[in-house]
């Protein structure tokens, strides 16, 4: 029997798929599309947080209005929908680390941790408990079958590609996951499908901010989670001059130029380092932001050969989600640690961000790891 569109040798009606539904247009289209093809669809939405103000905030996933939108799609398309309370799991696995990372002078990426520790771990196990054959999401990334099993590839639409946020997907998870939107040419194509299915979310805005950070105000969330933890200190030039004072390192990120509160200087200055132990924000000229060597740990490797089977890998890497991949040499130190040498220096490389590995002249993702303070 030929394989169905999800890769199983049985009819869609006998193939159960759990769809992770955020209430946005992407996952809603995935659910409607699979239901339309005759699959046994089960929609699941996670209740991740409750910040009051965030509940009715459009453009943030998994708040109250989003649960309502997901449920409405399920009712209209005729498949079951469940809401799971993951608030405690989400706080322990994502929010606490987010706050502690900022206090340690890092710039975290909680969306990666959410995929790694919540959606592709606990939710995936729930999908197995529901006896689903696979789990589908609305992420813009592709799963392709290679000679050694499923591979992770960038989305067809480079502007929507979410590979940076999914580098920690393990081979075992990838075997179970499906990404039906990864091959689409644009977000417009997704919205057209939503309109064809008559979904009320067809024109719903994309999520912009971190879901549990209303209006993008990270500092207020951290102060609420860790009262009094943000300690004032000095703003210091890299040459040692004291230029001013600050209200806590949580208000600053590497590469920041605006809002430093140290006007009247002839040269533009940027945050080049956050010294938490001394409570110092270190600033300097732009050239001090250039970084060539990056220490990376907690590596998730998705190559066919073992990571340590070669002394070095010639790959492309991304050090921020908004940056294009740059050529690099990745030198394994262990199975989970490496030194990454950028062939062209990058500015504003920050501890807490991810360093994601890509095939040099192709679309395949080879995994990645976390940048840490060691340079």
From Swiss-Prot:
The active site is at 114 (nucleophile), 211 (cysteine persulfide intermediate). It comes from Ruegeria pomeroyi (strain ATCC 700808 / DSM 15171 / DSS-3). The gene is mnmA. Residues 160-162 are annotated as: Interaction with tRNA. ATP binds at residues 20-27, 46, 138. Keywords: ATP-binding, Cytoplasm, Disulfide bond, Nucleotide-binding, RNA-binding, Transferase, tRNA processing, tRNA-binding. This is tRNA-specific 2-thiouridylase MnmA. GO terms for molecular function: ATP binding; tRNA binding; tRNA-uridine 2-sulfurtransferase activity. Belongs to the MnmA/TRMU family. One of its GO terms (cellular component) is cytoplasm. Its EC number is 2.8.1.13. Catalyzes the 2-thiolation of uridine at the wobble position (U34) of tRNA, leading to the formation of s(2)U34. It is an enzyme of class 2 (transferase). InterPro entries: MnmA-like (IPR004506), MnmA-like_C (IPR046885), MnmA-like_central (IPR046884), MnmA-like_central_sf (IPR023382), Rossmann-like_a/b/a_fold (IPR014729).
């Amino acid at each position: 029997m030929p394989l169905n569109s999800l890769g199983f040798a049985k009819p869609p009606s006998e193939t159960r798929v759990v769809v992770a539904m955020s209430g946005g247009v992407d996952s809603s289209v995935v659910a409607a599309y699979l239901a339309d093809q005759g699959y046994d669809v089960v929609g699941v939405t996670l209740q991740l947080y409750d910040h009051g103000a965030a509940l009715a905030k459009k453009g943030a996933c998994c708040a109250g209005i989003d649960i309502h939108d997901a449920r409405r799609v399920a009712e209209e398309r005729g498949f079951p929908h469940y809401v799971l309370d993951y608030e405690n799991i989400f706080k322990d696995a994502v929010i606490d680390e987010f706050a502690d990372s900022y206090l340690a002078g890092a710039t975290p990426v909680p969306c990666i941790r959410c995929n790694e520790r919540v959606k592709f771990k606990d939710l995936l196990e729930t999908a197995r408990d529901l006896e689903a054959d696979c789990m589908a999401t609305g992420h813009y990334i592709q799963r392709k079958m290679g000679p050694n099993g499923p591979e992770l590839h960038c989305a067809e639409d480079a502007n929507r590609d979410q590979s940076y946020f999914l580098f920690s997907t393990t081979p075992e998870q990838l075997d179970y996951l499906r990404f039906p939107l990864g091959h689409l040419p644009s977000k417009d194509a997704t919205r057209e499908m939503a309109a064809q299915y008559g979904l009320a979310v067809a024109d719903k805005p994309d999520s912009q901010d971190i879901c549990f950070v209303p209006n993008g105000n990270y500092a207020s969330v951290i102060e609420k989670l860790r009262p009094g933890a943000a300690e004032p200190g000095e703003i210091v030039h890299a040459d040692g001059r004291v230029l001013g004072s600050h209200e806590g390192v949580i208000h600053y990120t590497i590469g920041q130029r605006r809002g430093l509160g140290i006007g009247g200087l002839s040269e533009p200055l940027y945050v080049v380092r956050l010294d938490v132990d001394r409570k110092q924000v270190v600033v300097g000229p732009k050239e001090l932001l250039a970084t060539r060597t990056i220490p990376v740990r907690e590596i998730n490797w998705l190559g066919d050969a073992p990571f340590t089977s070669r002394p070095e890998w010639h790959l492309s890497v991304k050090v921020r989600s908004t940056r294009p991949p740059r050529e690099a040499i990745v030198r394994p130190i262990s199975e989970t640690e490496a030194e990454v040498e950028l062939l062209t220096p990058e500015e504003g490389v920050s501890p807490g961000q991810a360093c994601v590995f890509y095939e040099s002249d192709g679309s395949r993702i080879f995994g990645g790891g976390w940048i840490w303070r060691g340079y």
